Amino acid sequence: MSDPTASPLIWRDDGMPQSALYGDVYFSSADGLAETRAVFLAGCDLPAAWAGRDHFTVGELGFGTGLNIAALLDLWRREKAPHSMQGGQRLHIFSIEAHPITRDEAARALAVWPELGEAASVLLDHWPGLARGFHRIDLPGFDATFDLAVMDVEPALAAWDGAADAWFLDGFSPALNPAMWREEILAAVAARSAPGARAATFTVAGAVRRGLSAAGFQVDRRPGFGRKKQRLEAVAPGVAASPPRPRRLAVIGGGIAGAAMARAARAEGLEAMMFDDGQAPASGNPAALVTPALDAGGGPRAALPAQAFARAAALYEALPEAVIARGALKLSVVPRDEARHAAVADQDLFEPGTMAVLDAATATARLGEPVGEALSMSQALVVEPARVLDAWRGEVIDAQVARLAHEDGVWRLLGSDDQLLAEVDAVVLAGGAGQARLWPDAPLRPIRGQTSWTDRPLAFPTPAAFGGYVAPTRDGMLFGATHDRDDVGTDARAEDDRRNLRALAEGLPKLAASLADAPLRGRAAVRATTADHLPVAGAVPGAAPGLFVLGGLGGRGFCLAPLLAEHLAARILALPSPLPRPLSALVEPGRFSSRVATGAV
């Protein structure tokens, strides 16, 4: 396996960044920013092309140093329409980079153009990592969302479900990197283009002209920049359109799924109303351990929790005082765990070095009692649920939605006495195991779980997982949890506290012994899972348009909910999802449709 930390970039004597793989420069030695503005921004008729559009999507082949995106953001912030009572314009950016560079390398490259100012700063402050897959990047203050695909161009285009209004075709020279300019790639670009989309590139190579023409673009040569005599502009058939999109969303459920949904909806300009009847949400513990479900086999089932984990960690780190602790150890419990941990540590789905196998001596020193080998997850977090929910939920309407009715494109939320609670364009069911009231045939199974905690401080700073888990709270420690299928009781049970203590003794007997006389508090809640142990995030099958579900998160709600909520917000607004297609297929509620008799009521 190649070294994932090896830089694909070298610096020439004149200070220009050059690809170590292809031998080509990242941008023009004459003036890279001027070239970007002439070739890509003007070549795609920006800013005129986004005038009058609520949402505008730009795709790019070859993220490189981020110069094109920084220049685009600078132009967007200066030229987008101001906010109005109907909201404001939103920009979505999708770029592909098979060989990403580091934030420090990008900062050195972009420092040549201080005029990019805040646009370059926000990009560098949220610079994506090196893990393979899709990265959702926040660009605060720019009304923009950025998804970067760290993978080869062909699978990246196949995985993206968006349709770009403009394309920056900026790979290295066709002579040095011909694979990126193949006819199949340009056909895939066309397939991911909106009607009337424009594409621009610096090259006029015959293979590129023919490939764009064969894909259906009208191709024209234009005067080039600097020493290049010509460049290309291309226009896809059709006329650009701005279809009407939902404005008002109701979120039913006030736990982490609902809170994440409200945050994601508002980030995309939706007005989100939250309804919660306060019936023991599953997100009410004093601490939540945020770790991904691990799959040593790789593939989509491993990639989904890995991508969700990275996104969740970034969002929680941005919340003031939400993080209680960082890092966690997953102990080897059975002999096969050592091989599984080694396989996970070798996966490129996580940032390099963030999953590492520790020998028994090192793990023992970390935890203060004898343990075997362990997997160190340095980006794991312990968060305080109340701070996350308070930051994301917004105003909560204390009411039980007893029934939903759909008429003339409007969803009506009705209370227990059939009183009208709200009229909205779309509804998300995010009530966990309580979905059955509004979706009787939901493919969700209830699992009761009880956690236990004490005000005695945890002797070591590192959370640990061992079948059960233990994590610090603000003023003590939490451990657990029980898993009882088809039990919907939310009463705290002394026997379950004892079960949790016995499970703790199997993983960390010294710690468990120290708690033998400690007063324990327990809290029980009912979580929802599915037959295949994967969540559901999408349209409710069999229901009228505009009804969606986010659920089946099991015990991984704080890991999965933030990214899946962004995926669902994209589905609601017909925008590009942050999930690659193979991952979004895993969470489609319709995968159970053969067993679903009716939609929601």
Curated annotation (Swiss-Prot):
Catalyzes the last two steps in the biosynthesis of 5-methylaminomethyl-2-thiouridine (mnm(5)s(2)U) at the wobble position (U34) in tRNA. Catalyzes the FAD-dependent demodification of cmnm(5)s(2)U34 to nm(5)s(2)U34, followed by the transfer of a methyl group from S-adenosyl-L-methionine to nm(5)s(2)U34, to form mnm(5)s(2)U34. It is found in: Cytoplasm. GO terms for molecular function: flavin adenine dinucleotide binding; oxidoreductase activity, acting on the CH-NH group of donors; tRNA (5-methylaminomethyl-2-thiouridylate)(34)-methyltransferase activity. InterPro entries: FAD-dep_OxRdtase, FAD/NAD-bd_sf, MnmC-like_methylTransf, SAM-dependent_MTases_sf, tRNA_MAMT_biosynth_bifunc_MnmC, tRNA_MNMC2, tRNA_S-uridine_synth_MnmC_C. GO terms for biological process: methylation; tRNA wobble base modification. PANTHER family: SARCOSINE DEHYDROGENASE-RELATED, TRNA 5-METHYLAMINOMETHYL-2-THIOURIDINE BIOSYNTHESIS BIFUNCTIONAL PROTEIN MNMC. NCBIfam families: MnmC_Cterm, tRNA_MNMC2. It comes from Caulobacter sp. (strain K31). Residues 1-237 are annotated as: tRNA (mnm(5)s(2)U34)-methyltransferase. SUPFAM superfamilies: FAD-linked reductases, C-terminal domain (SSF54373), Nucleotide-binding domain (SSF51971), S-adenosyl-L-methionine-dependent methyltransferases (SSF53335). Its EC number is 2.1.1.61, 1.5.-.-. The gene is mnmC. This is tRNA 5-methylaminomethyl-2-thiouridine biosynthesis bifunctional protein MnmC. One of its GO terms (cellular component) is cytoplasm. It catalyses: 5-aminomethyl-2-thiouridine(34) in tRNA + S-adenosyl-L-methionine = 5-methylaminomethyl-2-thiouridine(34) in tRNA + S-adenosyl-L-homocysteine + H(+).
